[in-house]
Amino acid sequence: MTEVYIVGAGIHPFGRHDSTGLDQGIFAVRQALSDADVDWDDMQFAFGGSNSAGSADAMLPRLGLNGTQFINVANGCATGGSALLSGYWAIKSGEFDMGLVTGFDKHARGAFAAKPKNYGLPEWYAETGLMMTTQFFAMKIKRYMDMFGITDESLVRVAEKAFQNGSLAPHAWRRTPVDLSLIHISEPTRPY
């Protein structure tokens, strides 16, 4: 089997921008191609997805209609990761040598207004707050912590490290380190 490498990366700065989610995705794709010193015409495949900013294959007319197959991936918040895994296996299998993987999204301000029925879930799921990602993931991490003996302190340190890393990244949404004592305020969801 073939070795697989990520040879280029691109990212659009986080934040509120007037451009569409698709525009932001194309920005990141062009940046990744440039970073790898390759052209769109060099790509043998593309996997991409977006939960709410349109179909990733809508990039084709703007990147170039060169016959490259572009496969849409949909897996909610994990769409980008699932696209990456798909691209990995496309190369690892030996079927292709080089491809593009992208994931992008753009959400309106405020809480997500997902409808449980669209996801095959009962109404009580939303009524109890489980359609809100903060509540859902807070409950999920609490269960994971209990099952595997992960301490509260460990979780807080992960958040601290993430903020520190964000302070080093010019494209990050939050670029200010946050002290452990502030992160520790609100168990289990925390303000950060």
Where do the PLM segments sit?
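Active-site-proximal alpha-helical scaffold in enzymes
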Residues: 75-105, 134-168
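Single conserved hydrophobic/aromatic residue that forms the stacking wall/gate
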Residues: 183-192
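Condensing-enzyme catalytic core mediating Claisen C-C bond formation in acyl metabolism
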Residues: 1-19, 147, 156-157, 190
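Conserved beta-ketoacyl condensing-enzyme motif
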Residues: 17-85, 91-114
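Short acidic alpha-helix initiation/capping motifs at coil-to-helix transition points
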Residues: 23-25, 132-137
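Short acidic, glycine/proline-enriched helix-loop-strand junctions
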Residues: 109-127
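Molybdopterin (Moco) oxidoreductase catalytic core of the xanthine/aldehyde oxidoreductase family
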Residues: 118, 126-129, 141, 153-154, ...
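Ligand-binding pockets and gating/stacking loops
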Residues: 168, 174-179, 183
